[in-house]
Structure formats: C-alpha cells, structure tokens
C-alpha cells in the first residue's frame, strides 16, 4: 500500500504527491490517514502529483497529511442486504441500523453492457396516472424523464409513481437522492415504511448539503446496486431525483480541475459524463432496469444544455408546465409537450393511439383559438369550434387527478385509474357523450364513471 502526502487543497479538489513507482490510477480511491476521508483520483498532473475529488467535507485537512492508495476504485455493497437501508455515496449506512453485512462489493465505475446483451422492450408499464398512461406511456425497462422548473411538482409526481409502481411491482427498487432536500429523503423513507415496501427498496442519499464529490458520484452508487439486481435476473426500478444536480456537481468541480467552462458555464465534458451514466441504465437479456429520473429545468428553459443533453437518452419525457400548474391542474403535465416512443399504434394499439392523438388535437385547436376568444369572445366562433373548445376544457380538467401522496395536503382521497378506464373516459369526451355535463365535474376525478356520479349528485 503506497503512501503519499497532500500538497494542495482547493475546496473539494485535493492534490496528492506519491513516489514515482507508486502512482495511483485514474478513479483509484485514496484514503486520508488522519481523518479517514475518501478521495477519488481524477487527473495525473506530472511531477508525481495526482488531483482528486473529496467524497466528503475537506474541513480539518492540511498540507502534508499522509494519504494511502487503496489500489482500486470506490466499492459499494450490493445485493439483498442493502434493501431497507439508507446509505451514502460510499455505501456506508447512515440509518443507525448497524453494518450492512453484505457478501459482495462492486466498483461504482463499470462499462455499459455490450450491444449483443441488450434486450429491447415494448411491454407497457401502467402507472395509474391518466395523463401519463394516455399521452406518454412508459415502457418496462425504459428510461423516463420528469422535466420541470422549480415548484411544479417533479418530486410529488415521482413519489406518486413510486407509490403506484413500486407497491404494485413485486421486484426490487433503488432510490438515488442526488442533491435534493434532506426533508424529501426523509418523507420518502417514511412513505416507503408506511406502505410496507421498505424491505424491497435500497436508498442512497447524497443530499444538497453534501460536498460536490458526493453529489457527483451518488447516482453511480445507486446505479451499481440496481445493475447487480438486474444481472441476477430481476426487473428493477431505479428512481433518480434529481439528475440536474448530478450535472451541477460536475460543474462545481470542473473549474477546480482546471477545465475551461463551455456553454452557460457547464463543464466541457457534460455530454460524455451524462452518456457514461445513462448508457449503463439499460435492460439486458438477464433482467431489466426501468428508470424514472426527475430533471430540474433551470428558469423553465428546456433548451438549457443540461436538460437538452438528458433528452437524447430518454424513451419518454413527461414535461411539467408552469402554465398548466397556474390553471390549478395537477399533475401539471403538458400533454402537448410530453412524448413517448411507446405511443405507436403497433405497440399501444389503434384505439389508445387514436384517443391520445384526438386529445392532443382538441387541446391544440383550443390553444390556437385562445387569442380569438380573448379578442372577440366565444360567440364569434363557429359551432364546430365552440364544440371543440367545450370538449377541450373538459379534457383539460379530466387530465387532473388526486394523488395518494398528496392526500395530507388536499384532503381528497387518491385515485388509481387503469389504462382501460383512462382510454374509455377520454374517448367518451371526444365522442360527444359528455357534451351535456358541466366542465367543473371533470376536475380532480378518477374514472369517467365518477364524473357521471358527481353530475347526478349535483343535479
């Protein structure tokens, strides 16, 4: 085991000098002898000096401290012993429940599966959320992004998806909290505990208060645990909240590592860093990883390099819109902006496809007519356009839905709507069967039968 010494400390980036015959390799884990802090080698600078990122706070460090080279990358526990536990970026337990006691450790840096190992999938994953199941259906073994600015409901949507999918799903799940609020991590833990699925979930947290090294690597820690379950032949769910913080952590350390910033101040390696993570999140012939990732959109700008880079890797994109949220429609999913590769008549069937396109068509027409209505009023529209507007407003309200995880805030019981009921409901509105119903009865309901029941009560 070779020993070096710290020569320079700049925030989370630390330079260590080793002897010429004991130089660490890139991504090797180093340990500071006095504090036990782990560092990860990023660059070899020459003059026998390596530059490393600290996987923890650098307070208490000083030049001249001894550092050992472990000779291997960061390794984390994998397997069933991680289920029901909360771990940090190094796989160390942070839930005061004793050691993990794992039989196997895996390194967090792994190559993506080979092409011949990949297994494409067309099987749909029902979420019970109407707007998602209809407009941007998820594939089992696919990658989904929840895009949204600050405060439009990414985490609440993520929680509802976890509740609906993880509870109905008999397999294992991994949740990686990347640079998000500690309170949300705590809420999530208790939500899982109350739902009795905690024994099927591994939790890995590197929250907002952590140094950038932790936030940069915690997604890889969670992904490594998911890959192990997949390679055992299981179908795994991987939830990442929030992928933007992964990019942001890379930006924080990039300048300290001496790289020139690129567009909007992001690191020049943004695309390759994102690719290295996303290409590993895939399904093979052994098992599948279905991944749902929250993506923060800075200043609601979808063309920002970080969300724009993420788009390229996803099978379905759920775009949460501030304009929809302002109307009081939750989940605030924009049905005209959200997309899915699965929305294909050969995969979802003709009826589902036609109803989804019909819903988008009527909402698009309403959007086009809004200016005319604002200037001239509804009376100037043709009868056909009046009918379209009326149906669009009903569709818009019917896209809202009370969530189980929001019951404590709204007081309304959550609703799970099957895909069959979702298609039947929107088809009834588009076919004119609901033309005589007032639009307010469609707001915050589950199935179309509930709308009919509400209307009778009001009558």
UniProtKB/Swiss-Prot annotation:
Ligand binding (ATP): 148-155
A GO MF term: proton-transporting ATP synthase activity, rotational mechanism
Annotated EC: 7.1.2.2
CDD domains, A to Z: ATP-synt_F1_beta_C, ATP-synt_F1_beta_N, F1-ATPase_beta_CD
A cellular component annotation (GO) from this entry: plasma membrane
PROSITE patterns: ATPASE_ALPHA_BETA (PS00152)
Keyword Cell membrane: yes
Keywords in alphabetical order: ATP synthesis, ATP-binding, Cell inner membrane, Cell membrane, CF(1), Hydrogen ion transport, Ion transport, Membrane, Nucleotide-binding, Translocase, Transport
Pfam families: ATP-synt_ab, ATP-synt_ab_N, ATP-synt_VA_C
Enzyme class: translocase
Subunit-structure text: F-type ATPases have 2 components, CF(1) - the catalytic core - and CF(0) - the membrane proton channel. CF(1) has five subunits: alpha(3), beta(3), gamma(1), delta(1), epsilon(1). CF(0) has three main subunits: a(1), b(2) and c(9-12). The alpha and beta chains form an alternating ring which encloses part of the gamma chain. CF(1) is attached to CF(0) by a central stalk formed by the gamma and epsilon chains, while a peripheral stalk is formed by the delta and b chains.
Family: Belongs to the ATPase alpha/beta chains family.
Protein name: ATP synthase subunit beta
Organism lineage string: Bacteria, Pseudomonadati, Pseudomonadota, Gammaproteobacteria, Candidatus Pseudothioglobaceae
């Amino acid at each position: 085991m070779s020993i070096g010494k710290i020569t320079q400390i700049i925030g989370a980036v630390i330079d260590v000098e080793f002897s010429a015959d004991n130089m660490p390799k890139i991504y090797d884990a180093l340990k500071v002898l006095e504090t036990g802090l782990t560092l990860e080698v990023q660059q070899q600078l020459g003059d026998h000096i390596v530059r490393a990122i600290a996987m923890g706070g650098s307070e208490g460090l000083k030049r001249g401290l001894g550092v050992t080279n472990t000779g291997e990358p960061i390794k984390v526990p994998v397997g069933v012993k991680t289920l029901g536990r909360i771990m940090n970026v190094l796989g160390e337990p942070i839930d005061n429940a004793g050691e993990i006691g794992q039989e196997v450790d895996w390194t967090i840096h792994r190559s993506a599966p080979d092409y011949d190992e990949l297994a494409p999938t067309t099987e749909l994953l029902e979420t019970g959320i109407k707007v998602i199941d209809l407009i941007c259906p998820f594939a089992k073994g696919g990658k989904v992004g929840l895009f949204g600015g600050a405060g439009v409901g990414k985490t609440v949507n993520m929680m509802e998806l976890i509740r609906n999918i993880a509870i109905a799903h008999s397999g294992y799940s991994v949740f990686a909290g990347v640079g998000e609020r500690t309170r949300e991590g705590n809420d999530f833990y208790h939500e899982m505990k109350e739902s009795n699925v905690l024994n099927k979930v591994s939790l890995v947290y590197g929250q907002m208060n952590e140094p950038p090294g932790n936030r940069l690597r915690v997604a890889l820690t969670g992904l490594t645990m998911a890959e192990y379950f997949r390679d055992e032949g299981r179908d795994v769910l991987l939830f990442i909240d929030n992928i933007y913080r992964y990019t942001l952590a890379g930006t924080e350390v990039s300048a300290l590592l001496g790289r020139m910033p690129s567009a909007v101040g992001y690191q020049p390696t943004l695309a390759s860093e994102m690719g290295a993570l996303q290409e590993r999140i895939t399904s093979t012939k052994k098992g599948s990883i279905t991944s749902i990732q929250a993506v923060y959109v800075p200043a609601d700008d979808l063309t920002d390099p970080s969300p724009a880079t993420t788009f390229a890797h996803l099978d379905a994109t759920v775009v949460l819109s501030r304009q929809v949220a302002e109307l009081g429609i939750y989940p605030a999913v924009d049905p005209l902006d959200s997309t899915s590769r699965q929305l294909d008549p050969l995969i979802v069937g003709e009826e589902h496809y036609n109803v989804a396109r019909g819903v988008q068509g009527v909402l698009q027409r309403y959007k086009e007519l809004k200016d005319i209505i604002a200037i001239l009023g509804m009376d100037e529209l043709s009868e056909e356009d009046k009918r379209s507007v009326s149906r669009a407003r009903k569709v818009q309200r019917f896209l809202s839905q009370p969530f189980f995880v929001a019951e404590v805030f709204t007081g309304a019981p959550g609703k799970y709507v099957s895909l069959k009921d979702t298609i039947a409901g929107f088809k009834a509105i588009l076919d004119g069967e609901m033309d005589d119903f007032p639009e307010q009865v469609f707001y915050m309901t589950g199935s179309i039968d509930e709308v009919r029941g509400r209307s009778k009560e009001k009558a």
